[in-house]
């Protein structure tokens, strides 16, 4: 294992990342649940990336964040189906799963949760209507961000002003960089 910038990384195979992170923003008391999450770095043929912007005021504070589209895996649902469903709901995107990027294990101590974030690289085929939940519309005020790679990195850095933004950036910037590496190297790997 190689340690870089406080992040432990090792290859699951020759191409997938495994990143293990601790919550350094809130004190640990206990963890009472694990959450399986399917997430994606989404890009189009012109080189733009798509993310969600959340503007929220809750236990995590009054914050604005950038985050990959994704969410909880439903009972009986496989990871690839979950990521496609989440991308359709949150971005209105029909996508092709190019490959699995990796797995990030992280914690939200404030809500006593351990997250298993399964990241995929997905290419946009088309956009249609989004199907946001009530909370996504009214509590998180989700909107879509279309950014260049450099613009996305700047936005993650800008959102580090909040504790939640720092946790998200620590989890997602290494994944975004790996996704860009895959795209630059042809992007064609087995998605399974």
Task: Walk through the language-model features, giving the residues of each.
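Acidic, metal-coordinating catalytic segment for phosphate/diphosphate chemistry
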Residues: 2-39, 45
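A generic structural micro-feature
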Residues: 32-33, 62-65, 112-116, 136-141
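Short, charged/polar surface micro-motifs in flexible loops or helix N-caps
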Residues: 43-48, 57-58, 74, 121-129
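Conserved Nudix-box catalytic region and its N-terminal flanking loop in Nudix hydrolases
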Residues: 48-89
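Active-site-adjacent beta-strand/loop module that shapes the phosphate/pyrophosphate-binding cleft
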Residues: 106-131, 145
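Nudix hydrolase/Nudix homology domain
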Residues: 129, 135-192
